[in-house]
């Protein structure tokens, strides 16, 4: 059975006034409102015991501040902000009410470019850490086999960036190994686009009972990446940690034209 080498927690930023008012934000740099700050704190409580090693966020303040609040409980973890995790640029729609919209404006970021941007970040950031941990796992296995003389312990892999496609048997040696835990704080449109693209390209499969639907403010999605290069969407847009009943139901930044 393949081993999890990376666990990714993808969080949408907390609520903003524009979210509440149904205004398209796109790449406008809007702050969290009071409800958004509280949502971020509840998310921080939910993730307090998660041993994060790496943290990324969009450089827009609503995502960055959400990440900073979460990381207050993880003081040793450095936050890396990046424009790659920004929401889709919505052109003339930015700052406009969701009501009465039609086809996205011509100066909006093309869907193909938006999808490629999110995929590029995933490949260069997340998979890099997964590859590193897969290599670490293989070294530990080889060392354990050499130390204990288990010639028939499972054969490693590091293919597709992660592990080799050769089948292997379960090791009969115990290893001290923990996957890398990664935090990524972004926006509803980007999270939905990233996850949908990974599923369609079969880089991920949805876990049992997992449904892709609205990505609520401060929701948590979890992805497990295995040493064989495969991934599982463990949960999507989970809000069970939030005690805020009156959540914004519609994301104005997700184009439906």
Residue locations for each model-derived region?
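Short beta-strand scaffold positions
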Residues: 57-58, 116, 185-186
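Acidic, low-complexity terminal tails and accessory targeting/binding regions
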Residues: 2-6, 91-97, 147-180, 196-257
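Internal catalytic-core helix/loop-beta-alpha segment
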Residues: 106-169
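Generic beta-sheet signal
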Residues: 8, 180-189
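Phosphate-coordination/substrate-recognition cap region in phosphate-metabolizing enzymes
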Residues: 41-108, 124
């Amino acid at each position: 059975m393949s081993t999890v080498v990376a666990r990714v927690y993808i969080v949408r930023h907390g609520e903003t006034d524009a979210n509440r008012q149904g205004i398209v934000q796109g790449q406008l740099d809007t702050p969290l409102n009071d409800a958004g700050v509280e949502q971020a704190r509840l998310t921080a409580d939910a993730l307090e015991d998660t041993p994060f090693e790496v943290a990324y966020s969009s450089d827009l303040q609503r995502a960055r501040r959400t990440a900073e609040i979460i990381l207050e409980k993880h003081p040793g973890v450095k936050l890396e902000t990046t424009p790659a995790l920004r929401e889709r640029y919505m052109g003339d729609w930015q700052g406009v009410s969701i009501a009465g919209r039609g086809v996205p404006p011509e100066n909006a970021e093309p869907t193909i470019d938006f999808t490629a941007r999110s995929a590029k970040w995933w490949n260069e950031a997340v998979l890099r850490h997964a590859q590193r941990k897969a290599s670490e796992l293989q070294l530990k296995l080889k060392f354990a086999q050499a130390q204990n003389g288990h010639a028939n312990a499972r054969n490693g892999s590091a293919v597709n960036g992660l592990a080799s496609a050769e089948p292997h048997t379960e090791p009969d040696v115990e290893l001290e190994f923990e996957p890398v835990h990664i935090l990524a704080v972004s926006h509803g449109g980007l999270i939905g686009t990233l996850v949908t693209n990974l599923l369609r390209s079969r880089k991920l499969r949805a876990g049992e009972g997992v449904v892709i639907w609205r990505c609520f403010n401060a929701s948590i999605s979890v992805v497990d990446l295995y040493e064989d290069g495969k991934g599982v969407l463990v949960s999507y847009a989970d809000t069970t940690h939030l005690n805020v009943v009156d959540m914004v139901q519609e994301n104005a930044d997700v184009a439906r034209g």
